Every structure is written in structure tokens, then in C-alpha cells.
Amino acid sequence: MIQQETRLHVADNTGAKELLAIRVLGGSKRRYAGIGDVIVASVKDAIPGGSVKKGDVVKAVVVRTVKERRRADGSYIKFDENAAVILGSGREPKGTRIFGPVGRELRDKRFMRIVSLAPEVI
């Protein structure tokens, strides 16, 4: 579960290393974001020469959460860290590579480019 002020790792090669969630998109009273949900975030740490800089406000999609999520078949999925992928124009990722596994929920929410770039879909 991701909410305001949550810090997330960045799972792509845009140059950002850490994000701070500012807002969960999808309704004025929406408090939590899970895998496949879009958030507005600020870049808190970035490497020099990256496509995003520290302080940039970006949209990102959550790809991994520490909080377990129950699936329709009764199984649960959880990861070791909270991570997100920065989005560019539309729902396409800004980076060209994705690091680490991503949740299968991204396919259901039509983030096909992220699913195809990811090394593993769990």
C-alpha cells in the first residue's frame, strides 16, 4: 500500500533512484495505491546525467509493494520493496529498461510496454 509521503525505489533507467509519493490518482478521497495504480511523485534522489532531475514532479506506476495483495485465485503476492516506474507521455514508461520483477496486475491494467520490458512478471 502506497500513500502520501511513501518513499519508493525506481525500477527503471531514467536516472532517478528514489521517489516520494505526493498523491494517489483516481478520486479525490483515494488514500492507498497498489500494484498497477498511478501516483504523482517527486524525485528525491537521482544520478547525474539522467533524464529526470532531483525535485522533478512525475507520474509513476507502482510495480512492487511490500504489503501483500490477495488475487482472485486466493493466492497472495508481496515483494521486498516498494517500487515504481516513471511514466512519460500517456501510459508509456519514460525509461527503456525495467529492473526487477513486476506484478501481473500491470497486464490487467493495460501497462503492456512495462510488462514486455520487465525481466519477470509474477
Curated annotation (Swiss-Prot):
<dbReference type="InterPro" id="IPR005745">
    <property type="entry name" value="Ribosomal_uL14_bac-type"/>
</dbReference>
<comment type="similarity">
    <text>Belongs to the universal ribosomal protein uL14 family.</text>
</comment>
<comment type="subunit">
    <text>Part of the 50S ribosomal subunit. Forms a cluster with proteins L3 and L19. In the 70S ribosome, L14 and L19 interact and together make contacts with the 16S rRNA in bridges B5 and B8.</text>
</comment>
<dbReference type="GO" id="GO:0006412">
    <property type="term" value="P:translation"/>
</dbReference>
<dbReference type="GO" id="GO:0022625">
    <property type="term" value="C:cytosolic large ribosomal subunit"/>
</dbReference>
<dbReference type="Pfam" id="PF00238">
    <property type="entry name" value="Ribosomal_L14"/>
</dbReference>
<keyword id="KW-0699">rRNA-binding</keyword>
<dbReference type="GO" id="GO:0003735">
    <property type="term" value="F:structural constituent of ribosome"/>
</dbReference>
<keyword id="KW-0694">RNA-binding</keyword>
<dbReference type="InterPro" id="IPR036853">
    <property type="entry name" value="Ribosomal_uL14_sf"/>
</dbReference>
<protein>
    <recommendedName>
        <fullName>Large ribosomal subunit protein uL14</fullName>
    </recommendedName>
</protein>
<dbReference type="InterPro" id="IPR019972">
    <property type="entry name" value="Ribosomal_uL14_CS"/>
</dbReference>
<dbReference type="InterPro" id="IPR000218">
    <property type="entry name" value="Ribosomal_uL14"/>
</dbReference>
<keyword id="KW-0689">Ribosomal protein</keyword>
<keyword id="KW-0687">Ribonucleoprotein</keyword>
<dbReference type="GO" id="GO:0070180">
    <property type="term" value="F:large ribosomal subunit rRNA binding"/>
</dbReference>
<comment type="function">
    <text>Binds to 23S rRNA. Forms part of two intersubunit bridges in the 70S ribosome.</text>
</comment>
